[in-house]
Design a protein with these regions (language model features):
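Compact soluble domain cores
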Residues: 2-67
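Short, compact, well-ordered microdomains
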Residues: 63-109
Length: 109
């Protein structure tokens, strides 16, 4: 792994585990699960560790999918510039990157 990949993975893990270092959004379908279920779902994403070459080919921990209380769930982390207009010029550099964690039902992808 490159140093950039290690840094990107660490920043993604920070967002996923602690909801710091970026923003988190959810789809309407996830919101419809209710606030208590969403809290449990966020906790499940925080401890998610089933990363493998099939769902994490670049080793960045930027995607995951699993079943949550009978619902197929996906999460992904995207890298934008600080104005959220374009892709980040360097996802390993938090000074130029805004991370966005999106939580969705698989059917909403």
């Amino acid at each position: 792994m490159s140093t950039d990949t290690d840094r990107i993975r660490a920043l993604n893990d920070q967002l996923r585990r602690h909801l710091t270092g970026g923003k988190a959004v959810m789809t309407h379908g996830v919101a419809a699960l209710g606030s208590e279920a969403v809290q449990r779902l966020v906790q499940t994403i925080a401890i998610f560790d089933d990363f493998c070459t099939a769902n994490d080919p670049h080793g960045e921990h930027d995607f995951g999918s699993f079943e949550f209380e009978g619902a197929p769930i996906m999460f992904k982390i995207d890298y934008y510039d600080r104005d959220l207009n374009f892709h980040s010029p360097n996802p390993a550099d938090p000074a130029v990157t805004e991370r966005v964690l999106t939580i969705m039902l698989a059917e909403e992808y």
